[in-house]
Amino acid sequence: MFARNQSGSQGGAFYLASPGWRSHISDSYFVQNRATQGSSGYSDGVIFSLLSGNTIADNVSSRNGVYTQMGESEYMVSTFVNNTFVNNRLTAKSSSLSDKTNGGSAIYFKSGSGSLNLVNNTIVGNTDSCYTTSGVPSVNFNGSAVHVISGKVRLVNNIIAGNFSSAAAAGEVYLGESASLQNSTYNLYGGADRMNITAKSTDMVCRNYDRCVQDLQKVLDSEIVDGKLSLLLSDNGGFVPTVKVKSVACGNNNLNVLSAAALRESTFYIDINDNGVYTDNLAVDGRGVTRNTTGSMIGAYEYTGESGMEPNVQQNSIRVFVSEDNLYVISDSFTVGYTIYNLSGSLQMKGEAVSGRPVDVSILPAGVYMVETNDRSGGIEFTKVLKNN
Protein backbone atom coordinates (compact mmCIF):
# COMPACT_ATOMS: atom_id res chain seq x y z
CA MET A 1 0.00 0.00 0.00
CA PHE A 2 1.17 3.52 -0.88
CA ALA A 3 -0.86 5.82 1.35
CA ARG A 4 -0.84 9.53 2.31
CA ASN A 5 2.56 10.35 0.82
CA GLN A 6 3.26 13.93 -0.29
CA SER A 7 5.63 15.71 -2.66
CA GLY A 8 5.97 19.38 -3.51
CA SER A 9 6.83 18.46 -7.09
CA GLN A 10 6.70 15.10 -8.90
CA GLY A 11 5.91 11.71 -7.47
CA GLY A 12 3.81 11.53 -4.33
CA ALA A 13 3.93 7.76 -3.81
CA PHE A 14 7.00 7.07 -5.96
CA TYR A 15 9.36 8.78 -8.41
CA LEU A 16 11.18 6.72 -11.03
CA ALA A 17 13.54 8.41 -13.49
CA SER A 18 15.65 5.64 -14.98
CA PRO A 19 15.99 5.77 -18.78
CA GLY A 20 16.12 2.31 -20.30
CA TRP A 21 14.76 0.55 -17.22
CA ARG A 22 11.70 -1.69 -17.09
CA SER A 23 9.07 -1.65 -14.36
CA HIS A 24 6.14 -3.85 -13.35
CA ILE A 25 3.78 -2.72 -10.60
CA SER A 26 0.97 -5.09 -9.67
CA ASP A 27 -1.63 -5.69 -6.95
CA SER A 28 -0.85 -2.41 -5.17
CA TYR A 29 -3.13 0.15 -3.55
CA PHE A 30 -2.34 3.84 -4.07
CA VAL A 31 -4.56 6.00 -1.87
CA GLN A 32 -4.63 9.62 -0.64
CA ASN A 33 -1.24 10.61 -2.03
CA ARG A 34 -0.57 14.22 -3.07
CA ALA A 35 1.87 15.94 -5.45
CA THR A 36 2.09 18.67 -8.05
CA GLN A 37 2.39 16.00 -10.72
CA GLY A 38 2.07 12.23 -10.43
CA SER A 39 0.58 11.98 -6.95
CA SER A 40 0.26 8.20 -7.20
CA GLY A 41 3.41 7.83 -9.30
CA TYR A 42 5.78 9.64 -11.64
CA SER A 43 7.82 7.65 -14.17
CA ASP A 44 10.24 9.17 -16.67
CA GLY A 45 12.21 7.35 -19.35
CA VAL A 46 11.28 3.77 -18.40
CA ILE A 47 11.42 1.85 -21.67
CA PHE A 48 8.69 -0.64 -20.70
CA SER A 49 6.24 -0.25 -17.84
CA LEU A 50 3.38 -2.55 -16.93
CA LEU A 51 0.73 -1.74 -14.32
CA SER A 52 -1.67 -4.58 -13.59
CA GLY A 53 -4.30 -5.24 -10.95
CA ASN A 54 -3.74 -2.00 -9.03
CA THR A 55 -6.27 0.31 -7.42
CA ILE A 56 -5.49 4.04 -7.58
CA ALA A 57 -8.01 6.02 -5.55
CA ASP A 58 -8.46 9.38 -3.79
CA ASN A 59 -5.13 10.83 -4.90
CA VAL A 60 -4.72 14.56 -5.65
CA SER A 61 -2.43 16.33 -8.13
CA SER A 62 -2.34 20.09 -8.61
CA ARG A 63 -1.05 20.30 -12.17
CA ASN A 64 -0.63 17.11 -14.21
CA GLY A 65 -1.42 13.46 -13.93
CA VAL A 66 -2.40 11.43 -10.90
CA TYR A 67 -0.27 8.77 -12.60
CA THR A 68 2.30 10.37 -14.92
CA GLN A 69 4.38 8.61 -17.55
CA MET A 70 7.00 10.68 -19.40
CA GLY A 71 9.70 9.82 -21.93
CA GLU A 72 11.07 10.52 -25.37
CA SER A 73 12.09 7.15 -26.80
CA GLU A 74 10.06 5.86 -29.74
CA TYR A 75 10.48 2.39 -28.21
CA MET A 76 8.83 3.30 -24.92
CA VAL A 77 5.74 1.24 -24.11
CA SER A 78 3.40 1.77 -21.14
CA THR A 79 0.68 -0.83 -20.66
CA PHE A 80 -2.12 -0.64 -18.09
CA VAL A 81 -4.14 -3.86 -17.57
CA ASN A 82 -6.96 -4.56 -15.08
CA ASN A 83 -6.43 -1.38 -13.03
CA THR A 84 -9.05 0.66 -11.17
CA PHE A 85 -8.75 4.47 -11.16
CA VAL A 86 -11.52 6.08 -9.09
CA ASN A 87 -12.19 9.25 -7.07
CA ASN A 88 -8.89 10.90 -8.01
CA ARG A 89 -8.65 14.67 -8.44
CA LEU A 90 -6.59 17.10 -10.46
CA THR A 91 -7.12 20.60 -9.06
CA ALA A 92 -5.20 23.10 -11.20
CA LYS A 93 -5.09 26.88 -10.85
CA SER A 94 -5.74 28.94 -13.95
CA SER A 95 -2.98 31.41 -13.11
CA SER A 96 -0.35 28.64 -13.13
CA LEU A 97 -1.18 27.24 -16.57
CA SER A 98 0.46 28.41 -19.78
CA ASP A 99 -1.42 26.20 -22.24
CA LYS A 100 -4.01 23.42 -22.53
CA THR A 101 -1.63 20.52 -21.99
CA ASN A 102 -2.52 20.09 -18.31
CA GLY A 103 -4.82 17.34 -17.12
CA GLY A 104 -4.94 13.66 -16.27
CA SER A 105 -7.03 12.95 -13.19
CA ALA A 106 -6.16 9.30 -13.87
CA ILE A 107 -3.32 9.07 -16.43
CA TYR A 108 -1.05 11.67 -18.01
CA PHE A 109 1.15 10.44 -20.87
CA LYS A 110 3.79 12.34 -22.83
CA SER A 111 6.25 10.24 -24.78
CA GLY A 112 7.17 11.48 -28.23
CA SER A 113 6.22 8.57 -30.46
CA GLY A 114 6.06 5.97 -27.67
CA SER A 115 2.98 3.82 -27.00
CA LEU A 116 0.27 3.88 -24.34
CA ASN A 117 -1.91 0.77 -24.10
CA LEU A 118 -4.99 0.59 -21.87
CA VAL A 119 -6.65 -2.84 -21.61
CA ASN A 120 -9.62 -3.68 -19.35
CA ASN A 121 -9.25 -0.78 -16.93
CA THR A 122 -12.01 0.91 -14.93
CA ILE A 123 -11.49 4.69 -14.97
CA VAL A 124 -14.54 6.29 -13.39
CA GLY A 125 -15.47 9.14 -11.05
CA ASN A 126 -12.25 11.13 -11.38
CA THR A 127 -12.28 14.95 -11.46
CA ASP A 128 -10.29 17.51 -13.47
CA SER A 129 -10.93 21.10 -12.42
CA CYS A 130 -9.38 24.48 -13.15
CA TYR A 131 -10.99 27.82 -12.24
CA THR A 132 -9.98 31.45 -12.39
CA THR A 133 -9.66 33.54 -9.23
CA SER A 134 -13.24 34.69 -9.79
CA GLY A 135 -14.49 31.10 -9.78
CA VAL A 136 -15.12 30.82 -13.52
CA PRO A 137 -13.95 27.69 -15.38
CA SER A 138 -10.66 28.42 -17.12
CA VAL A 139 -10.77 28.44 -20.93
CA ASN A 140 -7.09 27.48 -20.93
CA PHE A 141 -7.82 23.93 -19.80
CA ASN A 142 -8.81 20.63 -21.43
CA GLY A 143 -8.33 18.38 -18.42
CA SER A 144 -9.51 14.79 -18.90
CA ALA A 145 -9.14 11.52 -17.01
CA VAL A 146 -6.86 10.09 -19.71
CA HIS A 147 -4.71 12.97 -20.97
CA VAL A 148 -2.22 12.19 -23.73
CA ILE A 149 0.08 14.91 -25.04
CA SER A 150 2.07 12.77 -27.46
CA GLY A 151 2.40 9.13 -28.43
CA LYS A 152 0.43 6.29 -29.96
CA VAL A 153 -2.67 5.20 -28.03
CA ARG A 154 -4.59 1.93 -27.97
CA LEU A 155 -7.79 1.70 -25.92
CA VAL A 156 -9.24 -1.80 -25.51
CA ASN A 157 -12.12 -3.06 -23.31
CA ASN A 158 -12.06 -0.13 -20.84
CA ILE A 159 -14.69 1.77 -18.89
CA ILE A 160 -13.68 5.44 -19.22
CA ALA A 161 -16.83 7.23 -18.19
CA GLY A 162 -18.41 9.37 -15.50
CA ASN A 163 -15.29 11.48 -15.08
CA PHE A 164 -15.94 15.18 -14.43
CA SER A 165 -14.08 18.12 -15.94
CA SER A 166 -14.61 21.85 -15.55
CA ALA A 167 -13.58 22.16 -19.22
CA ALA A 168 -16.48 22.47 -21.62
CA ALA A 169 -15.45 19.68 -23.99
CA ALA A 170 -13.37 17.27 -21.93
CA GLY A 171 -13.58 14.76 -19.12
CA GLU A 172 -12.88 11.30 -20.48
CA VAL A 173 -10.09 11.27 -23.09
CA TYR A 174 -7.96 14.09 -24.50
CA LEU A 175 -5.34 13.59 -27.21
CA GLY A 176 -2.95 16.41 -28.03
CA GLU A 177 -1.85 17.34 -31.53
CA SER A 178 1.17 15.03 -31.30
CA ALA A 179 -0.89 12.04 -30.13
CA SER A 180 -2.63 9.51 -32.37
CA LEU A 181 -5.34 6.95 -31.68
CA GLN A 182 -4.26 3.59 -33.10
CA ASN A 183 -7.15 1.49 -31.88
CA SER A 184 -10.37 1.79 -29.88
CA THR A 185 -12.48 -1.32 -29.33
CA TYR A 186 -15.17 -2.31 -26.82
CA ASN A 187 -14.81 0.75 -24.58
CA LEU A 188 -17.55 2.58 -22.70
CA TYR A 189 -17.10 6.34 -22.99
CA GLY A 190 -18.94 9.03 -21.07
CA GLY A 191 -20.10 11.06 -24.06
CA ALA A 192 -19.00 12.20 -27.50
CA ASP A 193 -18.74 15.80 -26.26
CA ARG A 194 -16.39 14.76 -23.45
CA MET A 195 -13.44 13.66 -25.54
CA ASN A 196 -11.67 14.67 -28.73
CA ILE A 197 -11.48 11.19 -30.22
CA THR A 198 -14.07 9.44 -32.35
CA ALA A 199 -15.53 6.25 -30.91
CA LYS A 200 -15.29 3.19 -33.15
CA SER A 201 -17.98 0.72 -34.17
CA THR A 202 -17.68 -1.60 -31.14
CA ASP A 203 -17.38 1.24 -28.60
CA MET A 204 -20.33 2.36 -26.48
CA VAL A 205 -20.98 6.04 -25.76
CA CYS A 206 -23.26 7.51 -23.10
CA ARG A 207 -25.78 10.18 -24.12
CA ASN A 208 -24.35 12.89 -21.86
CA TYR A 209 -22.53 13.31 -18.55
CA ASP A 210 -25.59 13.48 -16.28
CA ARG A 211 -27.21 10.44 -17.87
CA CYS A 212 -23.90 8.58 -17.73
CA VAL A 213 -23.58 9.20 -13.99
CA GLN A 214 -27.10 7.90 -13.39
CA ASP A 215 -26.55 4.79 -15.52
CA LEU A 216 -23.15 3.99 -14.00
CA GLN A 217 -24.56 4.28 -10.48
CA LYS A 218 -26.70 1.25 -11.32
CA VAL A 219 -23.71 -0.67 -12.69
CA LEU A 220 -20.96 0.10 -10.16
CA ASP A 221 -21.11 0.19 -6.37
CA SER A 222 -21.31 3.95 -5.91
CA GLU A 223 -23.35 6.94 -4.90
CA ILE A 224 -24.11 10.28 -6.52
CA VAL A 225 -22.88 13.29 -4.54
CA ASP A 226 -23.54 16.81 -5.86
CA GLY A 227 -24.15 15.41 -9.32
CA LYS A 228 -20.84 13.52 -9.44
CA LEU A 229 -20.21 9.82 -9.13
CA SER A 230 -18.41 8.69 -5.97
CA LEU A 231 -17.21 5.09 -6.17
CA LEU A 232 -17.28 2.76 -3.16
CA LEU A 233 -14.30 0.48 -2.66
CA SER A 234 -14.58 -2.81 -0.80
CA ASP A 235 -12.92 -6.20 -0.37
CA ASN A 236 -14.17 -8.31 -3.28
CA GLY A 237 -11.29 -10.78 -3.28
CA GLY A 238 -7.81 -10.20 -4.59
CA PHE A 239 -5.07 -8.12 -3.00
CA VAL A 240 -6.57 -4.63 -3.13
CA PRO A 241 -10.00 -3.02 -2.67
CA THR A 242 -12.06 -2.84 -5.85
CA VAL A 243 -15.39 -1.44 -7.06
CA LYS A 244 -18.03 -4.15 -7.23
CA VAL A 245 -20.07 -4.50 -10.42
CA LYS A 246 -23.78 -4.75 -9.62
CA SER A 247 -25.19 -5.11 -13.13
CA VAL A 248 -24.03 -5.44 -16.73
CA ALA A 249 -26.70 -3.05 -18.03
CA CYS A 250 -25.55 0.55 -18.45
CA GLY A 251 -28.50 2.40 -19.96
CA ASN A 252 -29.14 0.73 -23.31
CA ASN A 253 -25.73 -0.94 -23.34
CA ASN A 254 -24.73 -4.31 -21.93
CA LEU A 255 -21.11 -4.33 -20.78
CA ASN A 256 -20.53 -8.11 -20.79
CA VAL A 257 -19.85 -8.20 -24.52
CA LEU A 258 -16.33 -9.63 -24.73
CA SER A 259 -15.81 -12.96 -26.45
CA ALA A 260 -12.76 -15.14 -25.94
CA ALA A 261 -11.24 -13.57 -29.05
CA ALA A 262 -11.62 -10.08 -27.59
CA LEU A 263 -9.36 -11.11 -24.69
CA ARG A 264 -6.49 -12.35 -26.85
CA GLU A 265 -3.28 -10.44 -27.47
CA SER A 266 -3.44 -11.51 -31.10
CA THR A 267 -6.77 -9.68 -31.46
CA PHE A 268 -5.90 -6.31 -29.93
CA TYR A 269 -2.20 -6.68 -30.82
CA ILE A 270 -0.81 -5.55 -27.49
CA ASP A 271 1.94 -7.57 -25.83
CA ILE A 272 0.57 -7.26 -22.29
CA ASN A 273 3.52 -9.01 -20.66
CA ASP A 274 6.33 -7.93 -23.03
CA ASN A 275 7.45 -11.48 -23.84
CA GLY A 276 7.80 -10.67 -27.52
CA VAL A 277 4.87 -12.74 -28.82
CA TYR A 278 1.13 -12.17 -29.17
CA THR A 279 -0.06 -15.60 -28.03
CA ASP A 280 -1.42 -14.92 -24.54
CA ASN A 281 -4.89 -14.03 -23.34
CA LEU A 282 -6.39 -12.05 -20.50
CA ALA A 283 -7.67 -14.99 -18.46
CA VAL A 284 -8.47 -13.20 -15.18
CA ASP A 285 -9.72 -9.83 -13.96
CA GLY A 286 -7.96 -7.46 -11.58
CA ARG A 287 -8.79 -9.68 -8.59
CA GLY A 288 -7.69 -12.92 -10.19
CA VAL A 289 -11.25 -14.09 -10.91
CA THR A 290 -11.54 -16.05 -14.15
CA ARG A 291 -13.13 -14.14 -17.00
CA ASN A 292 -16.18 -15.56 -18.74
CA THR A 293 -15.03 -16.17 -22.30
CA THR A 294 -18.60 -16.33 -23.64
CA GLY A 295 -19.48 -12.86 -22.39
CA SER A 296 -16.80 -11.16 -20.33
CA MET A 297 -17.16 -7.74 -18.74
CA ILE A 298 -15.27 -4.72 -19.99
CA GLY A 299 -13.27 -2.96 -17.30
CA ALA A 300 -11.19 -4.40 -14.48
CA TYR A 301 -13.91 -6.38 -12.67
CA GLU A 302 -15.60 -9.52 -13.99
CA TYR A 303 -19.34 -9.64 -13.28
CA THR A 304 -20.41 -13.03 -11.96
CA GLY A 305 -24.11 -12.71 -11.21
CA GLU A 306 -26.81 -10.52 -9.73
CA SER A 307 -26.91 -12.55 -6.52
CA GLY A 308 -23.84 -10.69 -5.33
CA MET A 309 -22.02 -13.94 -4.66
CA GLU A 310 -18.47 -13.87 -6.01
CA PRO A 311 -16.47 -17.02 -6.67
CA ASN A 312 -13.80 -17.76 -4.14
CA VAL A 313 -10.45 -17.51 -5.85
CA GLN A 314 -9.12 -20.34 -3.73
CA GLN A 315 -11.25 -23.41 -2.98
CA ASN A 316 -10.47 -26.25 -0.61
CA SER A 317 -10.86 -29.55 -2.51
CA ILE A 318 -7.51 -29.10 -4.27
CA ARG A 319 -4.64 -27.64 -2.27
CA VAL A 320 -1.98 -25.72 -4.19
CA PHE A 321 1.13 -24.07 -2.80
CA VAL A 322 4.70 -23.12 -3.71
CA SER A 323 7.73 -24.01 -1.61
CA GLU A 324 11.07 -22.64 -2.81
CA ASP A 325 11.20 -23.52 -6.53
CA ASN A 326 8.53 -26.23 -6.46
CA LEU A 327 4.79 -26.21 -7.00
CA TYR A 328 2.78 -28.78 -5.04
CA VAL A 329 -0.75 -29.90 -5.89
CA ILE A 330 -2.57 -31.99 -3.27
CA SER A 331 -5.74 -33.72 -4.43
CA ASP A 332 -7.81 -36.88 -4.03
CA SER A 333 -7.09 -37.50 -7.72
CA PHE A 334 -3.75 -39.11 -8.57
CA THR A 335 -3.02 -36.58 -11.30
CA VAL A 336 -4.21 -33.00 -11.71
CA GLY A 337 -3.83 -30.74 -14.72
CA TYR A 338 -2.40 -27.33 -13.95
CA THR A 339 -1.99 -24.04 -15.82
CA ILE A 340 -0.02 -21.14 -14.36
CA TYR A 341 -0.79 -17.53 -15.32
CA ASN A 342 0.74 -14.29 -14.17
CA LEU A 343 -1.67 -11.63 -12.94
CA SER A 344 -1.85 -10.04 -16.37
CA GLY A 345 -3.45 -13.28 -17.56
CA SER A 346 -0.39 -14.44 -19.50
CA LEU A 347 0.20 -18.21 -19.69
CA GLN A 348 3.49 -19.16 -17.98
CA MET A 349 3.47 -22.97 -17.60
CA LYS A 350 1.11 -25.85 -18.26
CA GLY A 351 1.23 -29.55 -17.51
CA GLU A 352 0.06 -32.43 -15.33
CA ALA A 353 1.05 -32.85 -11.70
CA VAL A 354 1.04 -35.99 -9.58
CA SER A 355 -0.60 -35.29 -6.24
CA GLY A 356 2.02 -34.51 -3.62
CA ARG A 357 4.99 -34.59 -5.98
CA PRO A 358 6.92 -31.37 -6.71
CA VAL A 359 6.70 -29.56 -10.03
CA ASP A 360 9.82 -27.55 -10.85
CA VAL A 361 8.86 -23.88 -11.36
CA SER A 362 12.36 -22.43 -11.03
CA ILE A 363 12.05 -20.79 -14.46
CA LEU A 364 9.40 -18.43 -13.07
CA PRO A 365 10.62 -15.17 -11.53
CA ALA A 366 9.51 -14.20 -8.03
CA GLY A 367 5.96 -12.88 -7.92
CA VAL A 368 2.29 -13.71 -7.55
CA TYR A 369 0.69 -16.22 -9.90
CA MET A 370 -2.74 -17.70 -10.60
CA VAL A 371 -2.84 -21.51 -10.83
CA GLU A 372 -5.76 -23.18 -12.59
CA THR A 373 -6.20 -26.83 -11.62
CA ASN A 374 -8.57 -29.47 -12.99
CA ASP A 375 -8.99 -33.04 -11.80
CA ARG A 376 -10.58 -36.12 -13.33
CA SER A 377 -13.98 -35.25 -11.87
CA GLY A 378 -14.10 -32.18 -14.08
CA GLY A 379 -13.72 -29.73 -11.23
CA ILE A 380 -11.78 -26.55 -12.00
CA GLU A 381 -10.32 -24.35 -9.29
CA PHE A 382 -8.10 -21.28 -9.13
CA THR A 383 -5.51 -20.49 -6.49
CA LYS A 384 -3.23 -17.51 -6.04
CA VAL A 385 0.30 -18.45 -5.03
CA LEU A 386 3.36 -16.45 -4.06
CA LYS A 387 6.80 -17.44 -5.34
CA ASN A 388 9.44 -15.77 -3.17
CA ASN A 389 12.59 -16.45 -5.21
Labelled PLM ranges:
Residues 157, 186, 266-268, 280, ...:
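Conserved beta-strand and immediately adjacent loop positions that scaffold enzyme active sites
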Residues 53, 82, 120, 157, ...:
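Residue-level recognition of short loop/turn positions
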Residues 100-101, 293-295, 350, 383:
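Short capping micro-motif at the N-terminus of alpha-helices
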Residues 1-8, 14-254, 292:
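Predominantly extracellular beta-rich ligand-binding scaffolds that present long acidic/polar faces
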Residues 310-389:
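C-terminal outer-membrane/trafficking sorting elements
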Residues 25, 38, 104, 143, ...:
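Short coil/loop residues immediately preceding or within conserved phosphate-binding loops
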Residues 250-308:
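Surface beta-loop-beta hairpin patches that serve as ligand-binding interfaces in beta-rich domains
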